[in-house]
């Protein structure tokens, strides 16, 4: 109050002019203060959901970002999250989303795609206290920024709690505001710019593969770039570029010199603002440096969990040595250039050596100058690695006799010995990759017989395209490596005549497909041809420029190894690829073209009876065999009527072995082959293997009460004198604890686990469509088999039907239905079927009822979802549960 009284007395003594002067000073001071707070940060509109619809409006004042509180960043916690990437895409077919997925797939990183929700449910982020995702990627960062409050808070809390980062892309369009603030962040965007001369911030903590020593001179693709600006310490530029024009970017200042400044096209959020680390891109992945930095961003934000080591192994095969036509082969100067380039490449790749594949029959079949080149090449024989093709460059799948194949190989080996070519490299390549995949058994056997081959390579497994899916496998003791192309083919021999122009080849090398192949694959085996090393020597040009480019822009450590050691290294890294996945050769035209014409896909079965065991599969097998159009497999000497191909060691014998169990069809339209292997049902590998080889097959499974199935299996083992089953009661087996002996636990698992019906059917549904699977009621099959067989025939769609009411008869001695023969006789299953054994004890029945309760509930839900009728035993069980 005294201060207020003093102010009043002062005002009485001031003249009106003095009061106006003081007001003027106060207003001027206010303007300076306001200017500091309003323009210390550039103004901008938030690109919210409505931002694209308006190009006008006054931006709200923004306080200086340095005044915002700094939040601690949760360190990446690998043990608390699964190594899975959650990718939010605009649509399943959006280009950027597909490019993101392609890089993840090429790197063999697991991912899950979701359509980005504007409003709606967020995928479940945790499971039993563990994070389900190690990284979040948004194809459109505005979908993240404009999430509804509930989902945004849910996602942000997850990221903070589990140390999960976010990668986002901002792709401007014609409706984007030229300058705007990202809603909720101290970050400004300036969009629809043309940029040039991109450089890398050497201080960025993000960099791993990327080497920051170069500047990408020239215009960046597109005129829809966005750059980022902030003075908050949480933001660190990663890539920077200049604007193309001399005009300054609005809100960055009026100084004419500012147009030459570098602006961030990729920015890293260190998480100091809200505890979440992010990497934001101001465009899509069309610019090759964005792909490189994206790989580093994935590595950084996952604490290197989703990253490859810096080592890259490269092997360059030169196929068709001596094979080329006149005018396409190497001359003396070309051979010298090959040798000199090899030495040059060794400055960046220790011991780099070209790998030469030869067919000796064509030695000295060129011009005189080219024949001289052949001679000089052989004088350098110790300077290169060598591997054999076929003597006459014939495709191995055309040879059906192994001895003839071996004779061809022996001729090539004789040529090698005569000319001092080493024959112990253990590597061979078949012309056109014939016989490698699909497997031609005779080729593998002849290779081992003549050459002791341990390694080969192909571009055909599992398919030629897309190349990122190519994998390796091991068959018959021979390691098969994936082979890559490099943009060079037999007809690409002149630089100026390269398809699409020479710039296309340079684009492939400098940040394009060839660069990405090395970037995303720890081991690359490249296929080139003799013709690529004559004339303009495009092979030498390609790999010299590729290695220089990799050295300039990346920290990759380029290395090489001889083929056998390289294959061993490959399967150390990708041990999960050792087992092959056999596919239907007729589903891929390229595969069919290099598959023996003596083989036919019509020998493959169209129906699988998958089990489980002790549910009536053998009876169904007998009933199906009574149909004139249905033929079962030939019996196996080891496993009787069951082939057991897809679930065990027989799978590695290959599809030729499998087809031998089925006759060559006399009528491909009506003949319908089937096989029954009851172990398939609960196998973890059988569904995927079966779907790959038999993608159109129908699948039958029979279900009885899982408690009865468990008891039947126990009694089956007792009948076969299993010492564990004879030693322990059924109740002791099913209630055995974790400390029980391994043999007892094994018997327990075989009793109980096949009864997890829903779990196993779900696995089959992940490989086959629901309309390819029919679930049969095992209880009904036992009591009314004719009715069940009518359902089966309808499901199979056979052209002729059998009235099983007239062909089946009940045998009271056996206690089940048998085939009715002429004269009223019956043909029944063997003595091992239909055994009589004591009823299950009540304690075991009660235990199993409780044990299978949740499994049976899940089964009912699954069958309802599949649109299939619930078995009678399941309906009764569920009614008694209520």
Swiss-Prot record:
Name of a matching Pfam family: Sulfotransfer_1
Cytoplasmic side: 1-17
Binding, adenosine 3',5'-bisphosphate: 614-618, 712, 817, 833-837
Residues annotated as transmembrane: 18-39
InterPro entries found in the cross-reference section: Heparan_SO4_deacetylase_dom, HSNSD_N, NST/OST, P-loop_NTPase, Sulfotransferase_dom
Lumenal side: 40-882
Name listed for the protein in its UniProt record: Bifunctional heparan sulfate N-deacetylase/N-sulfotransferase 1
Gene: Ndst1
């Amino acid at each position: 109050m005294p201060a207020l009284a003093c102010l009043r007395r002062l005002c009485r003594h001031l003249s009106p002019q003095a009061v106006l002067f003081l007001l003027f000073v106060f207003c001027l001071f206010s303007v300076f203060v306001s200017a500091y707070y309003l323009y210390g940060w550039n103004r901008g509109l938030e690109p919210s959901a409505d931002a694209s619809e308006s190009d006008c409006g006054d931006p709200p004042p923004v306080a200086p970002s340095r005044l915002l509180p700094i939040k601690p960043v949760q360190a990446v916690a690998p043990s608390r999250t699964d190594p899975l990437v959650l990718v939010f895409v605009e649509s399943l077919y959006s280009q950027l989303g597909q490019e993101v997925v392609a890089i993840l797939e090429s790197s063999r990183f697991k991912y899950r795609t979701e359509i980005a929700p504007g409003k709606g449910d967020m995928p479940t982020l945790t499971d039993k206290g563990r994070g389900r995702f190690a990284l979040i990627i948004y194809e459109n960062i505005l979908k993240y920024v404009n999430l509804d409050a509930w989902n945004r808070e849910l996602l942000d809390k997850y990221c903070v709690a589990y140390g999960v980062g976010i990668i986002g892309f901002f792709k401007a369009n014609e409706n984007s505001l030229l300058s705007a603030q990202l809603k909720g962040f101290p970050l400004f965007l300036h969009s629809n710019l043309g940029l040039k001369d991109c450089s890398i911030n050497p201080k960025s903590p993000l960099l791993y593969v990327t080497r920051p020593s170069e500047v990408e001179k020239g215009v960046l693709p597109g005129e829809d770039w966005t750059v980022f600006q902030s003075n908050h310490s949480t933001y660190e530029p990663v890539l920077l570029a200049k604007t193309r024009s001399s005009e300054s970017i609005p809100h960055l200042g009026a100084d004419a010199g500012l147009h030459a400044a570098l602006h961030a096209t990729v920015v890293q959020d260190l998480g100091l603002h809200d505890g979440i680390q992010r990497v934001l891109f101001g465009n899509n992945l069309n610019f090759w440096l964005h792909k490189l930095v994206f790989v580093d961003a994935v590595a950084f934000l996952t604490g290197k969990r989703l990253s490859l080591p810096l080592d890259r192994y490269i092997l360059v095969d030169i196929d068709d040595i001596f094979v080329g036509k006149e005018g396409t082969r190497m001359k003396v100067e070309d051979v010298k250039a090959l040798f000199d380039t090899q030495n040059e490449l060794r400055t960046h790749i220790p011991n780099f050596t070209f790998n030469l594949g030869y067919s000796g029959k064509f030695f000295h079949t060129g011009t005189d100058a080219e024949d001289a080149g052949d001679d000089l090449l052989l004088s350098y024989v110790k300077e290169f690695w060598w591997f054999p093709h076929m003597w006459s460059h014939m495709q191995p799948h055309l040879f059906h006799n192994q001895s003839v194949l071996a004779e061809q190989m022996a001729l090539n080996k004789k040529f090698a010995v005569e000319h001092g070519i080493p024959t112990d490299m253990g590597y061979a390549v078949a012309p056109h990759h014939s016989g490698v995949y699909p497997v031609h058994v005779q080729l593998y056997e002849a290779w081992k017989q003549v050459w002791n081959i341990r390694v080969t390579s192909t571009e055909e497994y599992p398919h030629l395209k897309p190349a990122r899916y190519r994998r390796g496998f091991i068959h018959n003791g021979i390691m098969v490596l994936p082979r890559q192309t490099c943009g060079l083919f037999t007809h690409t021999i002149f630089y100026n005549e390269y398809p699409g122009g020479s710039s296309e080849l340079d684009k492939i090398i400098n940040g394009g497909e060839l660069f990405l192949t090395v970037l995303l694959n720890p081991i690359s085996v490249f296929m080139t041809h003799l013709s690529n090393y004559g004339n303009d020597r495009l092979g030498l040009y390609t790999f010299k420029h590729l290695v220089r480019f990799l050295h300039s822009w990346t920290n990759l450590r380029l290395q090489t190894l001889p083929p056998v050691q390289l294959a061993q290294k490959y399967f150390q890294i990708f041990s999960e690829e050792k087992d092959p996945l056999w596919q239907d050769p007729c589903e891929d035209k390229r595969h069919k073209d290099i598959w023996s014409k003596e083989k036919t896909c019509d020998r493959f079965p169209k129906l699988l009876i998958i089990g489980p065991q002790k549910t009536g599969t053998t009876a169904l097998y007998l009933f199906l065999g009574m149909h004139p159009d249905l033929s079962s497999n030939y019996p196996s000497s080891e496993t009787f009527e069951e082939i057991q191909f897809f679930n065990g060691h027989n799978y590695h014998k290959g599809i030729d072995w499998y087809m031998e169990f089925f006759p060559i069809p006399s009528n491909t339209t009506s003949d319908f082959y089937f096989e029954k292997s009851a172990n398939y049902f609960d196998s973890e590998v059988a569904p995927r293997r079966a779907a790959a080889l038999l993608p159109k097959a129908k699948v039958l499974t029979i279900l009885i009460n899982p408690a009865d199935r468990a008891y039947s299996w126990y009694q089956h083992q007792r009948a076969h004198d299993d010492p564990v089953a004879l030693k322990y009661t059924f109740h002791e087996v099913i209630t055995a604890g974790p400390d029980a002996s391994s043999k007892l636990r094994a018997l327990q698992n075989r009793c109980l686990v096949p009864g997890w019906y829903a779990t196993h059917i779900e696995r089959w549904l992940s490989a086959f469509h629901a309309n390819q699977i029919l679930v049969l009621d095992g209880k009904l099959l036992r009591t009314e088999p004719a009715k069940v067989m009518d359902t089966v025939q309808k499901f199979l769609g056979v052209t002729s039907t059998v009235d099983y009411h007239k062909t089946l008869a009940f045998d009271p001695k056996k206690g089940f239905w048998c085939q009715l023969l002429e004269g009223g006789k019956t043909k029944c299953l063997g003595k091992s079927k239909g055994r009589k054994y004591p009823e299950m004890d009540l304690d075991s029945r009660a235990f199993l009822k409780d044990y299978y309760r949740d499994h049976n509930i899940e089964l009912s839900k699954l069958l309802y979802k599949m649109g299939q009728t619930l078995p009678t035993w399941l309906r009764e069980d569920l009614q008694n549960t209520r």
